[in-house]
UniProtKB/Swiss-Prot annotation:
InterPro entries: Urease_gamma, Urease_gamma/gamma-beta_su, Urease_gamma_sf, Urease_subunit
SUPFAM superfamilies: Urease, gamma-subunit
Protein species of origin: Ralstonia nicotianae (strain ATCC BAA-1114 / GMI1000) (Ralstonia solanacearum)
Family: Belongs to the urease gamma subunit family.
Single GO BP term: urea catabolic process
Stated name of the protein: Urease subunit gamma
Length: 100
């Protein structure tokens, strides 16, 4: 199977998000890469589902709270930018203060 670099990046984010979901389900607090992957994957999936950029900018702030992540992780992530594929093309989604 041949994948473009962009497709490989999406697959890596999805895999990291899946691992983060499993760890979260076991009651573990997420670290920096797990938190970023989980939020990024949710945004990419929301774009595929047809949600708008504005909807996803808000949705990205509801996925995780400070209680879901290790100490200091929320401060390490001032914003997350994701290039997501929407029905009408690729757009950049920026989520400010994703973990509150």
């Amino acid at each position: 199977m041949e994948l473009t670099p962009r497709e490989k990046d999406k697959l890596l984010i999805f895999t990291a998000a899946l691992l983060a979901e499993r760890r979260q389900a076991r009651g573990l607090k997420l670290n920096y890469p797990e938190a970023v992957a989980l939020i990024s994957a949710a945004i990419m999936e929301g774009a595929r589902d047809g949600k708008t950029v504005a909807d996803l900018m808000y949705y990205g702030t509801t996925i995780l709270s400070r209680g879901d992540v290790m100490d200091g992780v929320a401060e390490m992530i001032p914003d997350i930018q994701v290039e997501a594929t929407f029905p009408d093309g690729t757009k950049l989604v920026t989520v400010h203060q994703p973990i509150v």
